[in-house]
Amino acid sequence: MPTDSDDHVDRRTVLKYAGTAGAVGLAGCSGNGGGGSGGGDGTGGGNNSDGGGSDGGSGGDTFELGVTMGQMDSGLDPQDHAETNTEIITGQMYEGLLDRDKEGGIIAGLANEWERTDDGSVRFTLRDGVTFHNGDDLTAEDVRFSIRRIVFNDVGIVSPQTNDLGPVSEVTTGDGEVTVSFDGYNPIAFQLFATNGDVMQQSWVEEHGSDYINRNANGTGPFRLTEYQSGNVVRYGPNEDYWDGAPAVDELSMSASSESSTRVNQLLAEETDIVTNVPPNEVSRVNSSDVATINSVASARIIFLQMRYDVEPFSSQQFRQAMNHAVDVGSIIENVLNGFGNLTAQPTLEGHVGYNPDIEPYPYDPAEAERLVEESGYAGAEITLQTPIGRYLRDVEIAQAAANQIDSLSNVSCELQQREFSSLVQDVTAPSIEDRPHFTLLGWGNAEFDGSQTLTPLLSSEGALTVLKNDELDGLLEEAETTRDSDERVDILQEANQLAHDLAPWVFMHQQFSVYGVSSDISWEPRADEFIDPDTATQQ
């Protein structure tokens, strides 16, 4: 079996950036043929189209499907982005070794067998008969190249997904198999590969530059690119040679409108078929129409108010606990979100590995909040809550309600500062904790469905987005990183969640719902991980 050694990845670097890339978790979770300018390699090119495309609206004998999101992609390189919307757009054309069903379970992808070896490595057996959109066969060397391009910064690009596959130390191939070794033991290797690691063709990538790769596509997925208008629309046609059968959709288009009201109006005008993030106040208008309905699902995203432990008054655990008692999250879910949310009490969502069912939410108790503020020594504190504008479902309205409730305490005043997400995320992801905001409304998506992928990046001392340093919590998370017994690992993560609840580095808010408007002409079910898979849609 031929082998090549790869560069060593330091384990503390993995702890620092564990989980999905920072911007993905915050922003996120989620191809191609034709006569493009690619000169005959089967890729779509620039603004050219061989498939006609569609601006949306299903009808007639041709199944045309339009999807309208809040934002477009940042380019079509599936390994060079860190946003959920880009993953949705590229994920129609590219796919990984493993996949997930809509409930989050791990299923086969480009690999139809997978196993852990005695030394802790993981081995994937590739399915036969898979071809790229240009007609070339998928090989184990393509998979090896793709993993290395993501993980190692000297293989073409510095990928923002560098740590998404864990502490990879070596990738070897042989006889239709790919073996991935790690620096230490990786207990969630298969979870990571079920969410990350889109595969590209090595020769195609090496032949073209970054600009070309970001405007064209050559994957193995169910759809081929037919037209790409940067920032405007992406059009696809079915991959008739797809290994799992061609999708029913004949013409797929993905576009965006940042205004939720505009998206809803397009849906009701039958100009598109699926729209994302329908505001709760628009739900009744959609449901009462004759052309569309609401389809919602509890997502893998948690919303919270993050407090930096090293600045006053948030340096006091009592003050942080007081903020949890000061915010009436249940009322916010009912009145601001129209019930589209679930109360949370810990960083790990129900159904994810490590969730602790014994932890109860902090009760809304302004008197207790005022008492704890007095005990903290920070009576009279003046604080400012920063919130993104339009990134999460009703984020500004949620933040305003929370700030008002805190401000109503007799011994704390709270103001609200609204910020564009593109600006705020730069501060939140600053390399040093000293440069991060003090008090911020944020969301985090955990597409791996494993508690460590929220706890480690957000709350460990070396976490990429941490606002906390606690030796006991660090010890638990490091133990969870290396424990091979799955039951023991669950116990460790449950203990870590209890400690995080008690330390109260966040005001624990809610589990966000994904609320979609869906045309009555189609049948389509949303997923918990926020990925949109049009290949599962059917005509009514």
Where are these regions (language model features)?
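Ligand/substrate-recognition segments at binding pockets and active sites
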Residues: 65, 374-445, 459-461
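Detector for C-terminal structural segments
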Residues: 2-5, 9, 16-20, 24, ...
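Short, solvent-exposed loop/beta-turn-alpha elements that line the ligand-binding surface or hinge
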Residues: 86-117, 153, 169, 194-225, ...
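Haloarchaeal acidic low-complexity proteome signature biased toward cell-envelope/secretome components but also
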Residues: 1-62
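Surface-exposed binding/hinge segments that line
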Residues: 115, 162-205
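Ligand-site clamp/hinge motif
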Residues: 235, 239-285, 296
